[in-house]
Amino acid sequence: MALRAAAGMHPRSLEGARVGLPNTWHGAVVRHADEIVGMGRVVGDGGCFFQIVDICVHPEHQGRGLGKRIMADLVAAIRERTPPGSYVSLIADGEAHRLYEQFGFAPTAPASIGMYWRP
């Protein structure tokens, strides 16, 4: 929760984290002096659909390639463990699309657009 806040990400409830984190399909963390300074997760149904979420690096550790290391770990797990034809998506905030493009992700527009709803 502290890393999300430090990186300027939208806050999540403690209750939501307690339910959601154990359902992570694959996760990656980067530690510095026993502190988590970077993270990323893959969530999904385990067969057809996967989403990369929670990619962030603490501002004091940005610009060192940690985001790229996290993405490389997540993409490697996806390539190794998902069935053929799986669909992997993510939402790119700000300039993060530049990182994701390095791993083969492409905008879906104009064929489709991402949408969200917060109940």
Spans of model-derived segments:
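Conserved acetyl-CoA pyrophosphate-binding loop and the N-cap/start of the following alpha-helix
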Residues: 61, 65-73
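A short helix-loop-beta-strand connector motif used in the catalytic cores of GNAT acetyltransferases and
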Residues: 18-29, 84-86
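Conserved beta-strand in the GNAT
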Residues: 29, 35-44, 48-51, 56
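Short amphipathic alpha-helix that is part of the acyltransferase structural core
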Residues: 1-15
